């Protein structure tokens, strides 16, 4: 956060941590992986709450993603991490694998909503994940200093829910 992603080096991290670059590379294969783990020490668990109706679940997903994207560490790191991920598909796969459990929960919730008749059966769970993450990411990138608020969450939820409900 202090110097920005583009100015961060593994050597600087090693020096500040009192270790060696070799030790860092044993744990993280790249700066992007190290920064990603620092920004996301654990995968977000927005859906640890009991399953509700799909509108409530979608609102919780949007709010949780917004809280993650507006944290100072993520705000500083994410543009650089995304650039590195775009240039390295293997890195992208490793980084995104940390979210597999969360994405599986979203998929399960959508399947259950289809089974309850709340959601169109042709809604692709992966598109829902992309829309929620993408809306938050774009807002964070386009509006520097943006802080998530209930009005934005409610409006975004209404738009997304309108697209998935029966």
Give residue spans per PLM region.
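Short, amphipathic alpha-helix enriched in basic
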Residues: 1-18
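Short amphipathic alpha-helical segment with a characteristic S/N-K-E followed by hydrophobic residues
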Residues: 7, 30-35, 45-46, 58
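Short hydrophobic/aromatic patch on the recognition helix
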Residues: 17-28
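Tryptophan-centric aromatic hotspots in well-structured domains and transmembrane helices
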Residues: 27-29, 137-138
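Amphipathic alpha-helical segments used for helix-helix packing
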Residues: 33, 38-39, 69-96
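Hydrophobic alpha-helical connector segments
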Residues: 46-78, 128
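Hydrophobic/aromatic-rich alpha-helical bundle segments in the mid-to-C-terminal region
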Residues: 92, 96, 100, 114-159
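C-terminal alpha-helix
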Residues: 109, 159-166
């Amino acid at each position: 956060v202090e110097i920005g992603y583009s100015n961060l080096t593994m050597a600087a991290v090693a020096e500040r941590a009192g270790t060696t670059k070799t030790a860092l590379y044993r744990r993280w294969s790249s700066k992007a992986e190290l920064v990603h783990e620092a920004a996301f020490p654990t995968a977000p668990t927005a859906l640890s709450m009991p399953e509700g109706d799909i509108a409530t679940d979608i609102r919780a997903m949007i709010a949780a993603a917004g809280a993650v994207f507006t944290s100072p560490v993520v705000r500083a790191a994410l543009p650089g991490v995304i650039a590195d991920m775009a240039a390295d598909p293997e890195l992208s796969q490793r980084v995104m694998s940390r979210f597999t459990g969360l994405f599986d929960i979203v998929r399960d919730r959508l399947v259950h909503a289809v089974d309850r008749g709340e959601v169109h059966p042709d809604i692709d769970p992966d598109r829902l994940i992309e829309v929620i993450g993408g809306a938050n990411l774009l807002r964070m990138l386009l509006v520097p200093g943006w802080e998530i608020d209930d009005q934005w969450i409610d409006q975004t939820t209404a738009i997304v829910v309108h697209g998935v409900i029966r």
